[in-house]
Regions:
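Catalytic core segments in nucleotide and nucleic-acid processing enzymes
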Residues: 1-160
Length: 160
């Protein structure tokens, strides 16, 4: 169910990325209600990966845009375009695509790279396996490793 998956995403991301992600808003309406974002958070990061995304002149991630895809197939170009279509000068150009898994992760990373190269913003994929890995870091008292994990995904997207 789409609603349950959104609730899972809100809770997981807020717990994992606290205190960087604050004030989650489900079904955030923009453009006078003509468009909807599954989840937004204010980016309150004062250091690390999300701070760098907030202060990067090409990203300016004031908000974290999250689209949730509870599919049994890989999200494709239209789903990435949906995320980047929610970016704006006030929101910024950073988003997370939450999905269950990727049959072809490399292809999805390539699509994220295309979006970034076309100056349409940065979309970071996070799947169930990533959530489990991030929660294990917290369980082992290694919360400081989360930034490195995010930088690793970002580095995959930057590779040519």
């Amino acid at each position: 169910d789409e609603n349950l998956f959104q609730d899972y995403c809100i809770g997981a991301l807020e717990f994992i990325f606290y205190p960087n992600f604050i004030k989650p808003k489900k079904e955030d309406r923009i453009h006078n209600g003509r468009k909807r974002i599954d989840i937004t958070y204010l980016n309150a990061a004062n250091d690390g990966f999300f701070y760098n995304m907030r202060t990067s002149p090409n990203i300016i991630a004031n908000k974290i845009v999250v689209e949730c895809k509870n599919y049994n197939h890989d999200p494709e170009n239209p789903e990435i375009d949906q995320v980047s279509g929610r970016f704006s000068p006030t929101i910024g150009k950073f988003g997370i695509m939450m999905a269950r898994n990727f049959e072809n992760r490399k292809l999805f990373i390539d699509r994220c790279r295309d979006t970034l190269k076309d100056s349409r913003g940065l979309v970071i994929p996070i799947v169930d396996e990533d959530i489990i890995n991030l929660l294990k870091m917290i369980e082992k008292q290694e919360r400081e490793s989360i930034d490195g994990y995010m930088y690793n995904i970002y580095s995959e997207i930057l590779k040519d």
